[in-house]
Each structure stands twice: as structure tokens, then as C-alpha cells.
């Protein structure tokens, strides 16, 4: 059997590029449920969103108690090419549970999105909350969200974020964020790091944001998180 020798770096790069493109073409499959969270089958990500089928997500809010008085949430800035909520500030880490996965398996998202290794035992479970979001005529998002909190004093530079999914990371003071949600203030100033796509480097960033700059979540969703944080203090 003859094994073809790889001639140089250019050929290696081409092999890696092809491999990455092939991995992107893999169809994601989700377990799907009825409104009572009883499993009814399996379907593709595309069909799940097109048909508005209930599915599960893993969501983790990272809380830093050293950045500002009262603590701060870590938010990710969604990449402009995301199919849902491009360019908006979102949960620290979140992802769909694949077919056959259990909730604890979702902890892999922290490694994939933020480059940190965390065990499920290091997270605090807030609970499950069901939410429906009609994003467009093509996307009806019905999710059973399993929500966790991870307390970490990492700096922004300690995270190796997934640059094809995330454009930046920001700390947002929890008290100010709560006032923004309650309509007591219109804007807040946040600081973080953002990917400069021209220079392909991470640079500091400061921006003034309002409620519409964040992905939408219900009042009940945020109460679930804030109540759990209060119980931990």
C-alpha cells in the first residue's frame, strides 16, 4: 500500500481547510419534544427552527465578583454572520443539546465557545425555563432552556473565545443591567474586548448600549437568574 507523502505546509493547510469545511456540513440533529417536555422524536436543526419544534439548550451565565461593585455578568457579542440575533449581546455561553445528549453534556459549550475547562459540579443550576421566540417567518425558536451560573474571577483576556461564533466579550455590571431591564435607565456604558476582523487581533472596546442591544429574554427568565444569585450571596 502506497501512502502519499505530504509535500509541504501549503498542502497541510489545504487538507485542514477541506476538513474544516466538511465538518461544517455535518447536519446537527436535536431531540424534539412536545409542550410538556415529552420526547417525540429527532429532527435536524433546520427543521426544528422552521417547524417551531421544542428542543433543549444549555445556558451558562458567568458571574465575576471582582470587576465591579455588586458583580458583573460576562456577555458575548454574537458574530455578525449568526443566523439568529447577529451582532447582539448574549448569554456568556449557550448551545443546543444534540440528539442523545443529557443536560450535563452541555458543559462542553464552555470549552468550545470560551476555551475554559469546567466540570458540571462547578456550576450552579438555576432551573429550566421554556421560552418561545418568533425570530422571523423562517425561524420559530421554542426552547427548554437549562440555565446555570458559573462564578469565576477570570479576566476577559483569560478566555479564548470562538471567533467564528463570537465577535467580543464584555463585562456588564449586574445592578446597572437590572436597572436597564426595569426601565429605570435607558443606556449603560460597558467595556470589553472585540475582534478586529481587519487586523485579526483582539482590541479593547467601550460602547454605550441600550436594551435592544441584548438578545430578548422574558421577565421570568431574568428573575430565575437574579433570584439564584441572591441566594448565593
Q: Which residue ranges define each predicted feature?
A:
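Alpha-helical and coiled-coil interaction segments, frequently adjacent to or embedded
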Residues: 2-17, 21-23, 28, 196
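Residues that flank catalytic or metal-binding motifs in active/ligand-binding sites
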Residues: 26-28, 56-58, 93, 125, ...
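Nudix hydrolase/Nudix homology domain
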Residues: 3-8, 127-135, 139-233
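Short, well-ordered beta-strand micro-motif
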Residues: 62-64, 77, 149-151
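A positional/architectural concept
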Residues: 28-62
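A short coil-to-beta-strand element that immediately follows conserved catalytic motifs
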Residues: 117-127
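Conserved Nudix-box catalytic region and its N-terminal flanking loop in Nudix hydrolases
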Residues: 19-21, 47-59, 68-113
